[in-house]
């Protein structure tokens, strides 16, 4: 009899655990996917699959390089054949044409460089039909690509002029002294080196590793673009090289100040309008209504701002003048459009975030930091514990602005993948989905959401758990599947406690969710194949925020498992 009872208890325990499995988990554990063979595709089908996530990007790179090559070639041929420049060609040789052709490419790049960082302009453009043709979400990538082109052709221009200055010095018997004079006392020389210094200062602090190590340094040095554009405007106005025949160049001090400013004036005007708009938006009444300290050094800031409309998946630029007057940092909104406030979850990892958290009253060094708690409420609120009411520092908010995650409702199936604090873009989206399920006002194409969250430690689940619990409770149709993965090594005592508490339970011992926690890293092969099997034919959007390496892996799997009848469309956060 005891043997029967043991068997019956074990059977009920397994039944209880299985009842918590999501449809995708059941399919993956059934072994059905292990025997599925990859479909053989025709060349046309392979091309169509390649076009889904790679084609437009590769096409853009090709067009970008082609245009630059054409501009350089046009400039070189023009200056090589122009009759009025024969004397210059005789003095300097081919490096004269190279320098001038590189300058022409720089004109082209300088005309483009500011448009991608005009955030309001990009957000408005995302709402037009052009968004289906131009990938406005790649605005930062385009800005970086253009910047590297400016660096490359600036050095081509500089090195070519080194030879030109050497030729002048040699033909006038001035030696190395003459070479130095031409470089550092001539108008084109000293303005060029000033621009080059500003440019390299911006570039060297913008590379990913230095930028992440010290964002404040990146922020301040990037404003040397003002120096760059100012000297760019006068760099060509010194008329150091005159044409052989009229019309002759008119130098500074008489009638002209050059024409280089004409190339960046349009982007510069829009960017200036953006900065003015930022200051005007900052004048709207904005204040912090509540501050919540979460485990894992996460600070939640709830903000009230007049005249602000948001959409799920958007982000803002946040400034706290008490910490820094000039710095604006990007944070993804974790509040839903349906809520009467906007919120961000700020991970305290750098100087700026550490100082902001301190100013807000967060104390992460305390022993009771393993539970979420309210640490501050706006002093005008009389409905809370007086001990929590305080005068909170003033903040400025610029935005909100669009992002790739904003497109989550465009697809029939959406796969949301967040690693650690990278879950923040999906907090807003999941909340909005929850509101739409409970208070339906408009139809949406979205019918299924897979949310995958990968964390290293137990505390990472704490601050987000209440939202996930609310979603599970209301999601009677199982439209949202939650898959949590714990990647940290588990101590023996912790593992024992988990097994005891999880046995015969209808909730997970770690998260409190109905869906069980998975240990280790996700098997992306099985996950992508399972989603495709369950939903073909359909189109799934894959949205990710987290480490670059994992993003590259997911990008590869999106390409690998797209086929006729089912497409995985790749999307990633860009700030």
Labelled PLM ranges:
Residues 138-162, 226, 419-452:
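Classical protein tyrosine phosphatase
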Residues 299-303, 340-348:
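A generic structural motif
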Residues 1-51, 485:
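Extended, low-complexity, polar regulatory segments
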Residues 329-335:
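Short beta-strand-centered aromatic/proline hotspots
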Residues 43-280:
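Membrane-embedded alpha-helical bundles of multi-pass integral membrane proteins
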Residues 3-10, 326, 344, 349-353, ...:
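Reductase modules of NAD(P)H-dependent flavoproteins
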Residues 233, 266, 270-318, 330:
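Membrane-proximal cytosolic interface modules of multi-pass membrane proteins
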């Amino acid at each position: 009899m005891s043997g029967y009872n043991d068997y019956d208890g074990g059977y009920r325990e397994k039944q209880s655990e299985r009842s918590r499995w999501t449809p995708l988990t059941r399919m993956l554990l059934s072994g059905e996917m292990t025997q599925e063979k990859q479909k053989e595709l025709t060349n046309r089908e392979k091309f169509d699959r390649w076009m889904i996530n790679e084609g437009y990007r590769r096409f853009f790179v090709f067009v970008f390089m082609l245009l630059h090559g054409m501009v350089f070639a046009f400039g070189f041929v023009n200056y090589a054949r122009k009759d009025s420049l024969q004397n210059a060609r005789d003095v300097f040789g081919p490096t004269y044409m190279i320098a001038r052709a590189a300058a022409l490419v720089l004109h082209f790049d300088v005309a483009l460089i500011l448009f991608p960082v005009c955030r309001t302009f990009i957000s408005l453009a995302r709402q037009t039909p052009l968004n289906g043709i131009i990938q406005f979400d790649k605005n930062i990538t385009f800005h970086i690509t253009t910047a590297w082109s400016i660096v490359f052709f600036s050095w081509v221009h500089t090195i070519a002029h080194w030879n030109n200055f050497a030729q002048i010095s040699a033909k006038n018997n001035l030696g190395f002294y003459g070479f130095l004079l031409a470089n550092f006392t001539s108008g084109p020389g000293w303005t060029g080196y000033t621009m080059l210094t500003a440019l390299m200062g911006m570039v060297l602090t913008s590379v990913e590793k230095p930028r992440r190590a010290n964002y404040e340094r990146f922020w301040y040095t990037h404003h040397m673009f003002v120096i760059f554009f100012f000297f760019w405007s006068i760099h060509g106005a010194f008329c150091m090289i005159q044409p052989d025949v009229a019309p002759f160049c008119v130098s500074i001090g008489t009638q002209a100040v050059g024409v280089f400013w004409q190339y960046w004036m349009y982007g510069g005007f829009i960017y200036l309008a953006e900065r003015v708009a930022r200051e005007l938006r900052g004048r709207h009444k904005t204040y912090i209504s509540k501050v919540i300290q979460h485990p894992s050094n996460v600070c939640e800031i709830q903000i009230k701002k007049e005249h602000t409309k948001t959409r799920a998946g958007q982000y803002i630029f946040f400034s706290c003048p008490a910490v820094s007057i000039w710095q604006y940092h990007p944070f993804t909104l974790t509040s839903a459009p349906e809520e009467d406030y906007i919120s961000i979850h700020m991970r305290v990892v750098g100087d700026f975030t550490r100082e902001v958290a301190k100013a807000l009253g967060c104390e992460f060094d305390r022993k009771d930091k393993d539970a979420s708690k309210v640490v501050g409420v706006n002093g005008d609120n009389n409905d809370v514990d007086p001990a929590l009411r305080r005068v909170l520092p003033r903040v400025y908010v610029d935005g909100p602005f669009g992002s790739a995650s904003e497109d989550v409702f465009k697809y029939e199936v959406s796969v949301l993948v967040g690693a650690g604090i990278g879950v923040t873009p999906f907090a807003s989206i999941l909340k909005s989905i929850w509101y739409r399920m409970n208070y339906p006002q408009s139809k949406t194409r979205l019918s299924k959401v897979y949310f995958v969250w990968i964390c290293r430690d137990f505390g990472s689940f704490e601050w987000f758990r209440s939202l996930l619990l609310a979603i599970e409770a209301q999601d009677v149709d199982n439209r949202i599947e939650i898959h949590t993965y714990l990647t940290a090594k588990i101590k023996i005592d912790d593992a024992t406690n988990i097994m005891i508490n999880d046995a015969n339970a209808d909730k997970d011992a770690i998260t409190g969710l109905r869906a069980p926690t998975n240990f280790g890293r996700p098997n992306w092969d099985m996950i992508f194949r399972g989603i495709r099997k369950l939903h073909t034919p359909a189109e799934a959007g894959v949205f990710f925020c987290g480490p670059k390496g994992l993003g590259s892996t997911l990008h590869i799997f999106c390409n690998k498992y797209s086929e006729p009848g089912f497409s995985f469309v790749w999307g990633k956060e860009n700030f």
